[in-house]
From Swiss-Prot:
Function: Required for normal transcription at a number of loci in yeast. Affects transcription at Ty1 elements, at PHO5, STE6 and ADH2.
Protein name as it appears in the record: Protein SPT10
Domain N-acetyltransferase: 121-259
Any Gene Ontology CC annotation: nucleus
GO terms assigned for molecular function: acyltransferase activity, transferring groups other than amino-acyl groups; promoter-specific chromatin binding; sequence-specific DNA binding
Region (Disordered): 1-30, 534-565
Pfam (any one): zf-H2C2
Positions with biased composition (Basic and acidic residues): 549-565
Note: Present with 1500 molecules/cell in log phase SD medium.
Species this protein is from: Saccharomyces cerevisiae (strain ATCC 204508 / S288c)
Gene Ontology BP annotations: DNA repair; negative regulation of autophagy; negative regulation of transcription by RNA polymerase II; rDNA heterochromatin formation; silent mating-type cassette heterochromatin formation; subtelomeric heterochromatin formation
CDD domains referenced in this protein's UniProt entry, alphabetically: NAT_SF (cd04301)
Amino acid sequence: MLNQHTSSVPDDEHLQMAHQNSSSEVRNEAAVPDQLLTPLQPYTILLKDGETIATMYPIPAYPDLLPLGLLNFLLDEFNMEVEKGDSFPYYETLSLEEFKNVWFHNDGHVCIMVLGEIPELDYSMDTEADTNDNFGTEIETTKHTTQYKKRKERRNLNLSMQWEKQCLGIFDLKPAYPGRSAHVVTGTFLVNAGIRGKGIGKTLMETFIEWSKKLGFTSSFFPLIYGTNVGIRRILEGLNFRRIGKLPEAGILKGFDVPVDSFMYGKEFTHITKSIDLLRDPQKSIEIGKYERLKHFLETGKYPLHCDRNEKARLRVLSKTHSVLNGKLMTKGKEIIYDTDQQIQIALEIHLMEHLGINKVTSKIGEKYHWRGIKSTVSEVISRCQKCKMRYKDGTGVIIEQKRAVKQAHMLPTQHIETINNPRKSKKHDNALLGQAINFPQNIISSTLNDVEGEPTPPDTNIVQPTFQNATNSPATTAEANEANKRSEFLSSIQSTPLLDDEQSMNSFNRFVEEENSRKRRKYLDVASNGIVPHLTNNESQDHANPVNRDERDMNHSVPDLDRNDHTIMNDAMLSLEDNVMAALEMVQKEQQQKINHRGEDVTGQQIDLNNSEGNENSVTKIVNNESNTFTEHNSNIYY
């Protein structure tokens, strides 16, 4: 699995070759053996400025394959970090030989990142697929030009360059353990101190992962990452490296009175677990770094290294609400847990006590601990609980997705007349109507009762055209015909209206019901004023002029505009009205009968009876209007 082609070169031969190269004034390595070539290809990228091109060259881990000036520059950079005393475990600076032993492993590789392209550092094998091996980028390179190939074949390592401006960074790639654990890779990273903060470290780490996979490594392990090294920790956690463990007080660093903790990070290349991606979002690494710096500031009273003004101000503000108690970061009496593994462990322990639900476990955790996304962590833990899976199997619930408007049931109005316990007070009507007698034309009542006793109102599209049966001699024939024509036009306009959606259709239906109720109410008033009252007044005036023929006219033509069958309909209509209406009608009929019996009385007596009749009929007008309002209120009291 692991490509160990570099181990075929014996150490004696390697030392002999190094001795020969050191004794020659010109280091010409044109004839490089195939054992020193690598299957990895150079990787050219575009830096953040969008213009500068940089190339990372994979080189087999032999120091003699590098220019001497480049080795000296790398040694100076490494010793500079050693002198800082906050990243590497060395007390003293290293010599060139010690540096070679640390960085160059026989079974490993070294990556040199430089500006532009330097063909002398290209130790890759010539393959047919190398044109597509630039990680899918479309950056144009000079790798296939004649000049590049000539410089690669010549390989003059005595290059006079300013490596402090040309070299951007370096990392080594080697097995973490020998033999049976040689498939685990580790490495060391170093970025040019003059150009840090440009994203070069993250680019080197990403390339480290890609090349490790190509060389056959299955996992990566970094055993000693100091807690104060915030930069590398952000990069590792941002690339889904798992923090495997912590080694307390593992580093005695400069600027710290007490030893600091170190952390171990690891990542699987072939068996990536779900917990890394599901429980660690891009903001998680930022949160961890924030709490680590805050804890360091509270414990030591000193700002962490490489903190800008905004970071220092933020630490001062957070120090007022946070504290360290027995090595634990606290806020408002709760312990802050920013370690992902510890968060999962706490949620699992509380859940396993009684196998509680998400909300109860979240509440119990919130009593003692604090971290961002407690509910998400609890949800992930409960989803893995086998006992809860057996208790609550999938598919027991029903999930409804609202994709369109749900049609609602609506009640259609029915024209049944019911008694209202508390009828609404009748409104004031025109004074001209109060002084006139009222009688009901049976054709109008018949049409109304047919609507009352029928089925519920049909839909708009199936409305039956109404018909009116009027006597030819009725004084209200013309008015009713006009009313019927208006209603026919109104219904035809409704039928011709295009169908709307549910809500608009119900609004149109509501307006139709309101207009229909108001129309029926106006019909009662129009009939009372135009058809019945003039008829009665005309009869009364004729009776005064010719009292002899009045009996014969009343007996033969009691109501001229009604036929014989309408008397039965009139009686049925009277039975459905209120008792007070019946009493009023009986009183009117009694008064009329008295007038017929006393037709021989003098004119003064007849005038008094007529005034009494008109007064009673005025009361009937009020009662009928009140009942009409009650009927309208009943029809309008429909819920939608």
